[in-house]
Amino acid sequence: MAAQVIPELQSLNLKTEGGALPQELAPSGAPENEDGDSEDDNGDDQGADESRTIEVLAAKKKKKKKPKKKKKDTQKAQTEPPRVILSALFPNNEYPVGELVEYKDENAYRTTNEEKRYLDRMNNDFLSEYRYAAEVHKQVRQYAQKTIKPGQTLTEIAEGIEDSVRALTGHDGLTEGDNLLGGIAFPTGVNLNNCAAHYSPNAGNKMVLQYEDVMKVDFGVHMNGRIVDSAFTIAFDPVYDNLLAAVKDATNTGIREAGIDVRMSDIGAAIQEAMESYEVEIKGTTYPVKAIRNLNGHTIGQFEIHGGKNGKSVPIVKGGDQSKMEEGEVYAIETFGSTGRGYVRDDMETSHYAKVPDAPNVPLRLSSAKNLLNVITKNFGTLPFCRRYLDRLRQDKYLLGLNNLVANGLVDAYPPLCDIKGSYTAQFEHTILLRPNIKEVISRGDDY
């Protein structure tokens, strides 16, 4: 803000060039110099005139109002819980940059190559949308990490996160098509203990978070379909610290190894080596931390959380996929560790669903299925949704129609994925952008 200049009083020139007062300041009826007046008299009269003139000017200056000071621009701060739309906190539309990691080895030239830097500058809208979504994610999760406590229901936790995302993006998702502009990218996962992924409470769920629980919190934010997918694990009992440390280390290893032309199998091998170097002691028994071999990271496409039909997977164990990462791709680098078998299966009640991209045109006989497909298309497109989101849109008695859409291959169901009962699982995840000249960990924050 430009400094406000308060004008100083200027020195007054009280005489004209001839030595007389300016006419407009001369007292009315003052006699001009006459012959015979003594020099002293002239001096006395002139001094009196000057005194009166100064008094007149001083009176005028007293009446003159000082210019009002401009109010200082005050930077808005986020509330608790987060409810201030992000654009109000960043009125210039310049959002924080993620962690920048230079490419290494044979790709090191990309950091200084002018052509690559030029290509990178072409992506301003793309980067702005991603950074907006990432900053929303960071602000929401940092508040969640401070306030999630034992005794809360899983529904309270999930809806608290979702309400904050809607407020900060400015999209409550209640108007048709609003959620496609920005907001929640997929249902909030609140996965306990042996359940690793895809669990979100349905209506009526009374499950309560306990002190002994290990909870994976996985949620997404999008702006114009640019999805930021990031997850963390909460445990109140320090006995699980090594489990969390193993998975966090593995995720950071995957991020470090990822890059243009890097083979997926090499990333998976590095992740597994990092994670399985840890063990955890629980109630007197020591468990090796195992990478969950049938869970993977993945590419992210616009409005497509798993990258669509050309999507790629990032393994978290050695062997397998020999394909390479490519310039311009977006990845969710996520790793899962377990004290169990290191393998998950479908279990419990399904909450997550998503419309199948480019699904064939299937004639639907159930009117409830037709109507529901129309609601899903207009409000979520190919973004995943859960049954609570249909409840918010005042849909009722939709389960028969939803199951019919799944049976006809128009909607995919994603049941919760769980290891053996009694085991504990952990997850950490970040979204990375493989920009032409640098790698940006878009969701990196001070927390993880």
UniProtKB/Swiss-Prot annotation:
Write out the annotated subcellular location. Answer: Cytoplasm
Q: Where is the signal peptide?
A: none
> Which reactions are catalysed by this chain?
Release of N-terminal amino acids, preferentially methionine, from peptides and arylamides
Coiled coil start-end: none
Record-listed a divalent metal cation 1 binding positions: 218, 229, 429
> Which spans are transmembrane here?
none
Q: Name one GO molecular function term.
A: metalloaminopeptidase activity
Residues involved in a divalent metal cation 2 binding? 229, 298, 334, 429
Q: Where is this region: Disordered?
A: 1-83
Which EC number applies?
3.4.11.18
| GO BP term, pick one | proteolysis
Pfam families, A to Z: Peptidase_M24
Feature: compositional bias, Acidic residues: 32-48
Q: Which InterPro entries match?
A: Creatinase/aminopeptidase-like, Met_Aminopeptidase_Type2, Pept_M24, Pept_M24_MAP, Pept_M24A_MAP2, Pept_M24A_MAP2_BS, WH-like_DNA-bd_sf, WH_DNA-bd_sf
Instruction: Name the coenzymes or cofactors required.
Output: Co(2+); Zn(2+); Mn(2+); Fe(2+)
Q: Can you list the GO cellular component terms from the UniProt entry?
A: cytoplasm
Sorted keywords for this record are: Aminopeptidase, Cytoplasm, Hydrolase, Metal-binding, Protease
Where mainly located? cytoplasm
Please note every region of biased composition (Basic residues): 59-73
Cofactor notes: Binds 2 divalent metal cations per subunit. Has a high-affinity and a low affinity metal-binding site. The true nature of the physiological cofactor is under debate. The enzyme is active with cobalt, zinc, manganese or divalent iron ions. Most likely, methionine aminopeptidases function as mononuclear Fe(2+)-metalloproteases under physiological conditions, and the catalytically relevant metal-binding site has been assigned to the histidine-containing high-affinity site.
Detail which positions bind substrate: 198, 306
Return the Gene3D superfamilies for the record.
Creatinase/methionine aminopeptidase superfamily, Winged helix-like DNA-binding domain superfamily/Winged helix DNA-binding domain
Q: What function does the entry list?
A: Cotranslationally removes the N-terminal methionine from nascent proteins. The N-terminal methionine is often cleaved when the second residue in the primary sequence is small and uncharged (Met-Ala-, Cys, Gly, Pro, Ser, Thr, or Val).
The family this protein is said to belong to: Belongs to the peptidase M24A family. Methionine aminopeptidase eukaryotic type 2 subfamily.
Query: Could you identify this protein by its name?
Result: Methionine aminopeptidase 2-1
Q: Which organism is it from?
A: Ajellomyces capsulatus (strain G186AR / H82 / ATCC MYA-2454 / RMSCC 2432)
